[in-house]
């Protein structure tokens, strides 16, 4: 494992921890898109169905378990534990416009036409756009809490570091995964506007807001 992947994993884990702490400490999921979190739960479930059949390392297995457990815990907190604080009126993105196209694309463009490989590919495609409901929600409300902004920034850093991970692997290992790279580029592009606002506003102590 190279440094970029390790730092990317840490950034991803930090994002998840920030989100869970935000919800638990405030006893509220206001400003959090439940739809994005459901999509992430679907992403990790589809990607890690090989948990009991494909052992790579203890680190890899532990990270898979953590991602799945945390994603479903987040969904439970939003839709059950703190359901009364969930802002469904602003979380209105039509997720079927994300799930259906990525599922079809996974059937058409994949590395191997097997159930696990198609599900893995689907998870890669879906993850690249899973944050859209959250960004759409921030756009509708006009602003985001600072901790939510930190969560989104950490997710963006995770994807950016993973792009460097692919570059590193291609240069030093000759490994090239076009599906993962293109999906990673799409996801990183979606964060570009947010990165700019985060640096120019949040880091200066202001609240983050997106153009409505």
Curated annotation (Swiss-Prot):
Family membership noted in the UniProt record: Belongs to the ERD2 family.
Post-translational modification: Phosphorylation by PKA at Ser-209 is required for endoplasmic reticulum retention function.
Recorded domain comment: Binds the C-terminal sequence motif K-D-E-L in a hydrophilic cavity between the transmembrane domains. This triggers a conformation change that exposes a Lys-rich patch on the cytosolic surface of the protein. This patch mediates recycling from the Golgi to the endoplasmic reticulum, probably via COPI vesicles.
Oligomeric form and interacting partners: Upon ligand binding the receptor oligomerizes and interacts with components of the transport machinery such as ARFGAP1 and ARF1.
Gene that encodes the chain: KDELR1
Effect recorded for residue 12 to A: Loss of recycling together with cargo proteins containing the sequence motif K-D-E-L from the Golgi to the endoplasmic reticulum
Species classification: Eukaryota, Metazoa, Chordata, Craniata, Vertebrata
Protein name: ER lumen protein-retaining receptor 1
Subcellular location: Golgi apparatus membrane; Cytoplasmic vesicle, COPI-coated vesicle membrane; Endoplasmic reticulum membrane; Endoplasmic reticulum-Golgi intermediate compartment membrane
UniProt GO MF annotations: ER retention sequence binding; KDEL sequence binding
Positions of modified residues (Phosphoserine): 209
Keywords for the protein's UniProt record, in alphabetical order: Cytoplasmic vesicle, Endoplasmic reticulum, ER-Golgi transport, Golgi apparatus, Membrane, Phosphoprotein, Protein transport, Receptor, Transmembrane, Transmembrane helix, Transport
Species per Swiss-Prot/TrEMBL record: Homo sapiens (Human)
Region of interest (Important for recycling of cargo proteins with the sequence motif K-D-E-L from the Golgi to the endoplasmic reticulum), ranges: 204-207
Segments crossing the lipid bilayer: 5-24, 33-52, 59-79, 93-110, 117-135, 150-168, 179-199
Its membrane topology: Multi-pass membrane protein
Interaction with the K-D-E-L motif on target proteins: annotated span: 47-48, 159-169
Known function: Receptor for the C-terminal sequence motif K-D-E-L that is present on endoplasmic reticulum resident proteins and that mediates their recycling from the Golgi back to the endoplasmic reticulum.
